[in-house]
């Protein structure tokens, strides 16, 4: 055909010179792109499915969102075949026509009856397989089923599962904090369906604000995250909720000694392919502990409430979601005071896969607000902190076979209101509004795509993935444009992979809590202050650089070993000035520091047994230009072992299949955290700056503590704990399932130290042995 076109054009002079390139390129432009999404019967993405275009040798794998794209298809008739473990093979007849350059498909796969038991294995825990479709270094995906296999404090919660991840340090059960690979809580970005969450954990730190059963997936980026995330310098926790049941009304209700809750979901009436989901839970720990655990020296004065609702319109890649949430938390310390906070927000997000275009469009907009108050008779005024604002944006992504190009625009605006008075009467107050704009571009290049055998299985995985990205983040209040290059890359073999990630990160927010406080109840948020003592700085923002190297190896069919080394350089940090004595002293100081470590994780998975073990070595240093010290979360060694075993007959209900019995355990070991030793006490005279001071010769001063000049030079004893759980499932009817869970926390009653009161020398331990019984009804 092409030769005939060239012959017809011969001898036509100028027309030949103009039309010849079009004649050559015409057949190339006539090629078609076939793209789409592969979903299961619940509307969730089928990840890693093999998509082949028969009878050609073209093929690819679905990505993390179930999407695929096959380009360069000549006009003609083909059969698109989709295969994956646990689903029936899909075959779709495709007619490629040059008049329709892009063909968009939405494929729904039915569960394979033959592979049903295998499906249960995959759902019960993350498969012990290397993911060939994306760079996974410094990323831990958490599925709800993984959380449910962990022995829990009354009810399974993502906060408890985060504690067993490599690189995570947890400082205590009551008011403790979560530190991810050398970063503080304020340096961790938490997103709920795209909305910024200011306080992801309750004061009783074993509970997050997220009901486990509404979660679709949690992605924890512990270092080296890409340009799609910004505004934080250490880590990201991206939480996505699932839609409600599209087919029928269903739900669950549960009761434990500390928490009770319910979740309901179902299709919206009169609107096709739509659903709703609503969850609520109430913590009544303060009321329950005196009756159920009379041996506790101190009650647990905690109360909290979590509410979440969501409606979904559409299934698969074309979808609109609207959601709202509210959380409250209260700690009554009696004579010491009362700390309470509330958090609420609402928003929406959508995804769209246009039929006649190669682009995929996603967008989101959300508003959230957090208020915290602490009232104590020992303080002149109540502490108060409030932060709230909006964030939103649009992302446009293109699939070119296995390659992907994405770019986005974002906008954020928030305001802060902070008031704090210290013991000398010095007031720290800030009211400020900020606007930020950002844009990023990310390109994922697959240098060598997998070749598919005749049986439809990969002969070898994708050999190399390079994912450079660039984020431009403009801070309007400071007139500062932050240029943040990022890079993620992966090299795959048959049974191994090598990965790396690096980047520059900047953030605006500062915590009003000192990094040197162990117990944190009051949470204050401020924007980055101008620090007069460091006027030579080019900007007041916090800044860090990351480098991560990792490798995976498939030991056997059921073992997966992951090893990662990481380094974070904090070139500019802002902290509370604990040495402030006079009004002219700065409220904040600048610090620098670094953190590095090595994390090992080994996962073993069979149909009935799941084992997950981790070990972390971590080293943290800070320099406040007075001294170099270890921060309080500098735990040198951490080890975790999590296991679960299921047995007994299957309990079949509409919601799925479950084994009747399940036993699980969790054991944690951590070396001692650093602390500053007490040298003695002295009488401190008060000199009030307003001139009305008492004569020092007759004044009765206050008791003050003389601390060692070497900050955090000593270590607390090591921490270790064993938790056990046994679960029994009984089918009550075709649609009802009753779960009974008996758990034992701190099974051998290890007295792990939390902190020691310096004045009274009283030791406060973390939670002792605590047996629990929980009931859950599912329908």
Language-model region placement:
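Short, acidic, small-residue-rich periplasmic hinge/interaction motif at the N-terminus
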Residues: 39, 44, 49-54, 83-85, ...
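Short, acidic Ser/Thr/Gly-rich low-complexity loop/linker segments typical of extracellular
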Residues: 56-67
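C-terminal beta-signal and adjacent terminal beta-strands/loops
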Residues: 303, 656-661, 668-702, 716-723, ...
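Outer membrane beta-barrel strand-and-loop segments of large Gram-negative receptors
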Residues: 389-393, 430-440, 536-540, 546, ...
């Amino acid at each position: 055909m092409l030769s005939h076109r060239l012959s017809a054009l011969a001898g036509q002079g100028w027309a030949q010179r103009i039309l010849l390139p079009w004649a050559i390129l015409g057949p190339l432009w006539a090629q078609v792109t076939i793209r789409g999404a592969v979903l299961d019967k619940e509307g969730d993405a089928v990840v890693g499915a093999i998509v082949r275009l028969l009878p050609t040798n073209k093929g690819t794998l679905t990505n993390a969102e179930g999407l695929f794209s096959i380009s360069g298809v000549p006009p003609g008739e083909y059969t698109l075949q989709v295969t994956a473990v646990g689903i029936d093979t899909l075959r779709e007849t495709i007619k490629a026509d040059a008049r329709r350059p892009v063909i968009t498909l939405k494929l729904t796969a039915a569960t394979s009856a033959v592979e049903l038991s295998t499906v249960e294995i995959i759902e019960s825990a993350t498969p012990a397989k290397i993911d060939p479709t994306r760079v996974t270094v410094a990323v831990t995906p958490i599925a709800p089923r993984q959380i449910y296999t962990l022995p829990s404090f009354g009810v399974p919660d993502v906060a408890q599962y985060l504690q067993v991840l490599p690189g995570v340090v947890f400082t205590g059960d009551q008011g403790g904090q979560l530190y991810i690979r050398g970063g503080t809580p304020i340096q961790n970005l938490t997103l709920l369906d795209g909305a910024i969450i200011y306080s992801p954990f309750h004061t009783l730190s074993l509970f997050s604000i997220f009901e486990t059963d509404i979660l679709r997936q949690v992605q924890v980026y512990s270092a080296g995250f890409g340009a799609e995330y910004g505004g934080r310098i250490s880590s990201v926790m991206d939480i996505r909720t699932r839609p409600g049941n599209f087919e029928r009304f269903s739900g669950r209700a549960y009761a434990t000694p500390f928490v009770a809750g319910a979740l309901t979901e179902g299709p919206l009436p009169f609107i096709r392919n739509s659903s709703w989901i609503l969850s609520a839970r109430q913590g009544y720990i303060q009321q329950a502990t005196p009756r159920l655990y009379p041996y506790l020296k101190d009650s647990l004065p905690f109360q909290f409430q979590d509410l979440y609702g969501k409606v979904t319109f559409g299934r698969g890649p074309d979808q609109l979601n609207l959601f709202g949430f509210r959380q409250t938390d209260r700690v009554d310390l009696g004579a010491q005071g009362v700390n309470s906070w509330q958090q609420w927000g609402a928003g929406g997000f959508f995804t769209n896969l246009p039929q006649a275009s190669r682009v995929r469009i996603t967008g989101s907009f959300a508003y959230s607000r957090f208020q915290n108050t602490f009232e104590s008779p020992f303080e002149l005024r109540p502490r108060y902190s409030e932060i709230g604002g909006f964030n939103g944006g649009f992302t446009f992504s293109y699939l070119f076979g296995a390659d992907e190009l994405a770019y986005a625009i974002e906008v954020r605006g928030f305001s802060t209101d902070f008031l704090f008075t210290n013991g000398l009467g010095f007031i720290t107050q800030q009211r400020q509004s900020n606007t930020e704009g950002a844009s990023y571009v990310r390109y994922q290049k697959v240098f060598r795509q997998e070749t598919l055998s005749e049986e439809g299985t990969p002969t070898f995985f994708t050999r190399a993935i390079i994912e450079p990205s660039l984020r431009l983040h403009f801070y309007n209040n400071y007139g500062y444009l932050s240029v943040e290059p990022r890079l993620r890359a992966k090299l795959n073999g048959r049974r191994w992979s090598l990965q790396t990630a690096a980047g520059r990160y900047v953030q605006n927010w500062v915590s009003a809590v000192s990094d040197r406080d162990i117990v944190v109840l009051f949470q204050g948020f401020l924007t980055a202050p101008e620090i007069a003592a460091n006027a030579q700085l080019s900007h007041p923002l916090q800044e860090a650089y990351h480098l991560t190297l990792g490798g995976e190896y498939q030991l056997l069919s059921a073992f997966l070993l992951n090893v990662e080394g990481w380094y974070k350089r904090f070139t500019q940090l802002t902290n509370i000035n604990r040495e402030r004595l006079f009004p002219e002293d700065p409220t904040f100081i600048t610090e620098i520091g670094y953190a590095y470590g090595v994390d090992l994780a080994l996962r073993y998975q069979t149909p009935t047994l799941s084992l997950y073990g981790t070990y972390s070595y971590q080293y943290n240093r800070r320099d406040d230009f007075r001294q170099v010290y270890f921060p309080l979360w500098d735990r040198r060694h951490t080890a975790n072992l999590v296991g679960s075993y299921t047995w007994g007959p299957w309990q079949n209900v509409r919601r799925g299949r479950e084994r009747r019995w399940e036993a699980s355990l969790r054991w944690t070991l951590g070396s001692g955290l650093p602390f500053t030793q007490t040298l003695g006490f002295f009488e401190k005279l008060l000199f009030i700056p307003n001139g009305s001071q008492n004569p020092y010769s007759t004044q009765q001063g206050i008791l003050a503590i003389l601390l060692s000049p070497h900050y955090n030079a000593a270590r607390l004893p090591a921490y270790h704990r064993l938790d056990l759980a046994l679960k029994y499932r009984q089918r009550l009817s075709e649609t009802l399932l009753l779960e009974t869970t008996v758990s034992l926390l701190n099974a051998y009653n290890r007295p792990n130290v939390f902190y020691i009161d310096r004045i009274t020398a009283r030791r406060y331990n973390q939670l002792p042995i605590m047996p629990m019984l929980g009931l859950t009804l599912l329908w």
